[in-house]
Amino acid sequence: YGNNEVLEKYDNICREYTVEPKDQSIIPAFLPLYTPVRLGKYTVTALKAYHAPEEKYPYIYLITEGNCTLLYMHDTGRLFDEVYDYLIKNNVKADIISYDCTFGLLKSGGGHLGLDSCALEKDKLFENGISDKNTRHIINHFSHNGGAIYDEIVPIAAEYGFETAYDGMEV
């Protein structure tokens, strides 16, 4: 599921390679912005992201299963006001928020977050009632661009109230 740009890239890749999938495990489908869509046991809402300048319509996701709501903020910089407007208008209460933390301990900017901007978003989400004292805030999506290794990030992230994701982590 994705935006039209993702679907177009997928179609181009499928045409470029002669080997086709033997089954229909991948069926591309458009997911419209700000429209909750039922996908199996999940309700998924695409929200506008800020990623790479050449990407016209990148998405982050709001995913709900039963009474649990995850705000999945990967491959994005700071959230747009229209995302906050949607979350506030729809009275979204996130149980878990997974933050892009590509820049780690370095100053962030552009289409990814670092711990500095994760902390700003965490505060803004709390101030707007989207998160509360029971929300789990988890940083994820690390890279070599972060200026620190995992063991260096964990204690600093904890000071800001973040859990630091690890391979195999289940929430």
Annotate each PLM feature.
Residues 19-29, 40-42, 93, 133, ...:
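A short helix-to-beta-strand connector/capping loop
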Residues 28-89, 169-171:
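Core dinuclear metal-dependent hydrolase active-site scaffold
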Residues 1-29:
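Active-site HxH/HxHxD metal-binding segment of metal-dependent hydrolases
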Residues 79-169:
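Cap/insert and terminal regions of metallo-dependent hydrolase folds
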Residues 4, 74-76, 101:
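Fold-independent oxyanion-binding glycine-rich loops
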Residues 1-3, 27-32, 136-144:
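Extended hydrophobic secondary-structure segments that form protein cores and membrane-embedded regions
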Residues 8, 51-54, 104-106, 145:
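Short, acidic Gly/Pro/Ser/Thr-rich loop/turn segments
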